[in-house]
Amino acid sequence: MKISQLVRMFILAAPLSGAAAAADDSAAALNLVFPAFKPEVYERVEIAVSGMPAAANPFDPEVVALDAEVAAPSGKVVRVPGFFERQFSRKLEGGREVLEGGAEGWRIRWLPVEPGRHTLSVRATLAGKIAARGEAVIEAVPGKRHGLARVDLMGMRWFRLDDGTPLFLDGLCMCWHGRRGTYDYDDWLESSQKAGINYIRLWMWHQAFGIEWDRGDKLKYRMDNAWRLDRVLAEAERRGVLVMLCLDYHGIFEIKPDYWGGNNFWPHHPYNAANGGSCQLQNEFFTNAEARKLYEKRLRYIVARWSAFPNLLAWEFFNEIDNEYACLKHADVVAWHRDLGRFLRGIDPCRHLISSSFTGGSERPDLYALPEMDFSQYHSYNEPHPAEMMAAKTERFFEEYRKPFLVSEYGTDWRGWKPATDPHFRALHQALWSGAFTGAAGTAMSWWWENIHSANLYPHWSALAAFLEGTGIGRADLRPARFDTVEGGVKPFGISSRTEALVWLLDRAVDWPDGATNAVPPSLTGAKVVLTGVDDGAWSVQWWNTAEGKRVTDAQAVASDGRLRLEPPAFQADIAARLSKK
């Protein structure tokens, strides 16, 4: 449905919606306008609020704030902060997105997570004192939505949705847009949906969705970028795509231009004392009380505006924070993540997952050990044999932290898109497919999204999505498989339970960078592997072409003494199998 249609529906529904009188004589009345239809559980509700008291700065909750207490039928009460916004419209002029500002106002976004009648008690405060009140009753009805992403507490290795549906992430980074702005995401997300991609990563930074970046931004958030993020999150939701939202990145601490000739934003940062902030040095971002207070206010705004999106997978505090450890202290960074993680968890009514990330090839154990960090991440660049990397890192990180693990950035070279080193995209293919066969919570997240789109490399994702459809991937009983016999020049990877397994065999001759320039690798025959730890008896085996995402042949096998012998048909580069106990 188009945004304009949604807006019309909202306006037309307003006369049928509820508006509350003041709760007492000393407070004015807030007018709450919301759609007339009953929302489904996990369907975002937008409430326009008028009657707010005038204030000098609508972004400072110490000056003026809007909050709702929502009492659910179960008796659970959550607090949902409201936010000030400005509407925009967009158009393309000369290949560049141009925004035109529109109406301003206050809004509450709320996500019902159970059916039944919910009572919303809304209040506006001015300098900490109640200035206006309103109440509303909204009934949520059962629907088909699966809920929010959580850690599967049964096995701790995977994600799941609230209704228990297993969640394996098949995606890539799409961190910012180009000159076409949100129009880029219209194209990228359409292609993602067609390819079965269910997960992307966005950054809030100066080039795209950042709201507090420059000298004049302190507590004066950028409404144009906020509107862009609204639109992209809504489009991703419509396309069935989850989003990990990265709130900051290492460039805010850089002073000198980096390898790419930029990313040195500390001289412009609003928390920098040179710009009227409270931080003389970059590390004071993590230790200064005023800086923390400002960041908590920004987090409140972020939660108010975007936590109600059910496709928000996680908040990621920082991208590659240790890129700037020359001017930062790791202990202070960890303490900040602990404290702000607790703060964020406490104000987020949906309790989305939380994480953070380090530079390529780096790991800092004490941060991921924090209970405030729900999953661990690794960025892989310039590493040979991506499937082995994925298997080794997944096993090590899981053994260390007992949390889901993601390779959330991947590339054959951190310096840029280098197709000459991977002309047939085997590294990309192997990084993607290996994620599904090593116990990782998702595929490796390729970094070079614009190049991937222009080269139409989405079939690598769609083939994997087709293979995984209908499997049990993400179930708590599926764990990295073990093989005790390997013959015929293959590397085996897999996940298995006693009665189900997914197996992927990689020809060693094209294990990137080996054989990278070989356009047509020879057909591999005579491979044999033995999968262990399975129930005895008859098994069905489906062999799949991984380039096309299609079944090529079915076979039968018999397990004895917990061992299942697999003999694939002839294949080129790699082949996958779906196995199930009869």
Task: Specify the residue positions occupied by each region the protein language model found.
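Aromatic- and carboxylate-lined catalytic core of secreted/periplasmic carbohydrate-active enzymes
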Residues: 32-33, 37, 54-56, 413-416, ...
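Extracellular glycoside hydrolase catalytic/binding regions
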Residues: 297, 304, 321-468, 522-524
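Boundary at the C-terminal end of the N-terminal hydrophobic targeting segment
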Residues: 19-23
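Extended acidic/polar, glycine-enriched regions
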Residues: 76-78, 83-154
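Short, hydrophobic beta-strand segments
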Residues: 49-51, 106-113, 568-570
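Non-catalytic, glycine-rich low-complexity segments
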Residues: 24-74, 80-82, 86, 137-141, ...
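Bacterial N-terminal signal peptides
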Residues: 8-18
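Active-site mouth of glycoside hydrolases
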Residues: 63-65, 125-127, 143-387
